[in-house]
């Protein structure tokens, strides 16, 4: 009974969104929810149906009393079949373990990204304005600028390709 009340309290949309489930995991969870809802509906319908049979009424109506006696005997001796659900429980536990593992991996990635973004934000906040930087400081921060400049100068080019088209010719001569 506790499992039934716990299952009713699950907010499936919140579970999917708060864990950030996507793709196959979200689809599996939705399929599980659908099976759960279908089973709950069937149990509700069956529990509302009457479960007693008035065999005296059938004895009065039917001429063949042997048939009624046989059916009553089978009804009284009926034992519901029990099913081994351990396989399904193992599958659910494996799904849960996989979902937890995926969530932990995602959590680790998110935390690493947050740390990286925090460092970037600190660098942005503590950085000097661009117009106050020296050429040496820019070259130290981006060594490829020095390499590109050295390459252009060694080829006899004194301006990067497309500079005049973009910024115009600034020469006075």
UniProtKB/Swiss-Prot annotation:
An example of a Gene Ontology cellular component annotation for this protein is: proton-transporting ATP synthase complex
Q: Which GO terms describe its biological process?
A: proton motive force-driven ATP synthesis
Q: Is Transit peptide tagged as a keyword?
A: yes
Query: Which keywords does UniProt give here?
Result: ATP synthesis, CF(0), Hydrogen ion transport, Ion transport, Membrane, Mitochondrion, Mitochondrion inner membrane, Transit peptide, Transport
GO MF term list: proton transmembrane transporter activity
* Transit peptide extent on chain: 1-23
**Known InterPro entries for this protein?**
ATP_synth_F0_dsu_mt, ATP_synth_F0_dsu_sf_mt
Q: How does it sit in the membrane?
A: Peripheral membrane protein
- Where is it mainly found? mitochondrion
Q: Does the keyword Transit peptide apply?
A: yes
Q: Where in the cell is it found?
A: Mitochondrion inner membrane
**What does the record note on quaternary structure?**
F-type ATPases have 2 components, CF(1) - the catalytic core - and CF(0) - the membrane proton channel. In yeast, the dimeric form of ATP synthase consists of 17 polypeptides: alpha, beta, gamma, delta, epsilon, 4 (B), 5 (OSCP), 6 (A), 8, 9 (C), d, E (Tim11), f, g, h, i/j and k.
What the entry lists under PANTHER family is as follows: ATP SYNTHASE SUBUNIT D, MITOCHONDRIAL
Its job: Mitochondrial membrane ATP synthase (F(1)F(0) ATP synthase or Complex V) produces ATP from ADP in the presence of a proton gradient across the membrane which is generated by electron transport complexes of the respiratory chain. F-type ATPases consist of two structural domains, F(1) - containing the extramembraneous catalytic core, and F(0) - containing the membrane proton channel, linked together by a central stalk and a peripheral stalk. During catalysis, ATP synthesis in the catalytic domain of F(1) is coupled via a rotary mechanism of the central stalk subunits to proton translocation.
Q: Which family does it belong to?
A: Belongs to the ATPase d subunit family.
Name the UniProt record assigns to this protein: ATP synthase subunit d, mitochondrial
Q: What organism is the protein native to?
A: Aspergillus terreus (strain NIH 2624 / FGSC A1156)
